[in-house]
Every structure is written in C-alpha cells, then in structure tokens.
Amino acid sequence: MNPAHLLVLLAVCVSLLGASTIPPLPLNLVQFSNMIKCTIPGSRPLLDYADYGCYCGAGGSGTPVDELDRCCQTHDNCYSQAKKHPACKSPLDSPYIKIYSYTCSGGSLTCRDDNDECGAFICNCDRTAAICFAGAPYNKENYNIDTKKHCK
C-alpha cells in the first residue's frame, strides 16, 4: 500500500478516536474475531456476538444476562484497563486499533512474545475473552434483546 494512503488511514483512525460523542469501532475486530474462530471453529463472531446480551457489541450496561454476556463484560473491563495501562499511552495503543501477534494451534491461543507490553496486555484481553466464549453456552433468546428493558 502506498505510504500516503497509510498516513490518510492513520489520520482517519486517530480522528475517530478523538470524537468524544461517537464511540470508536474496534478496528482490531478482525483479530478478535479470528481468536474466537480459533476457540470455536465454525462460529460467526461478527454476526453472533455483535448484539448479544447487555455487553456483547458496542457499549454495555446493567447486569449481564448470562455467562456469555459476563465474558463480554469482562472483556469490556479489560479494554478499560488497557486504556489506563502505563504502556498504552499512545493513541496508537488504543485497544480498538492496536495490532498484536498471536498464534492459533488446535484451538489453543498463544499471545506471542514479540508483542510490546501494551500489545501483550490487549492480546491477553482478547485471548481470555475468546476462551471464555468457548466455555459459555450461546442462548439465542439473548441475541438482539431490548437492552432498555433487560440491562438495568
């Protein structure tokens, strides 16, 4: 890719992070999605988990509706910790855009040693959540729920 295009893309990403009224979309969603596919082969993370319970997807509030939703709440909390982590001070270290390296082998995830401290922290947030998802039942009745009613 042309370096000028990369700079424009980076500028757009940084400006999105600075927009206080618009929550940033996780730009490393592909990595997290692939981690989930590693622990749950055949799953469709972007479809199945983007609007599940009170915490899976954008935002989150109230009491989690089940074990899977608690996995998402824990993941949200981990990202909040990452934003405050001393090694994650740069806007480029946001958990929503930070790229890290990991391996998937036989359903087992490993965050690689070549990650910097911030990347390792965020990788472990995603790894822990993917493992949690794999151990939690998926209840279809908790997909696309009325969050105003169920997430108080």
Swiss-Prot record:
Keywords assigned by UniProt, alphabetized: Calcium, Disulfide bond, Hydrolase, Lipid degradation, Lipid metabolism, Metal-binding, Secreted, Signal
Positions annotated as propeptide: 22-27
Gene3D superfamilies recorded: Phospholipase A2 domain
Organism for this UniProt entry: Laticauda semifasciata (Black-banded sea krait)
Biological role stated in the UniProt entry: PA2 catalyzes the calcium-dependent hydrolysis of the 2-acyl groups in 3-sn-phosphoglycerides.
Cofactor: Ca(2+)
Protein name (Swiss-Prot/TrEMBL): Phospholipase A2 GL16-1
Enzyme class, UniProt record, top EC level: hydrolase
Keyword Signal: yes
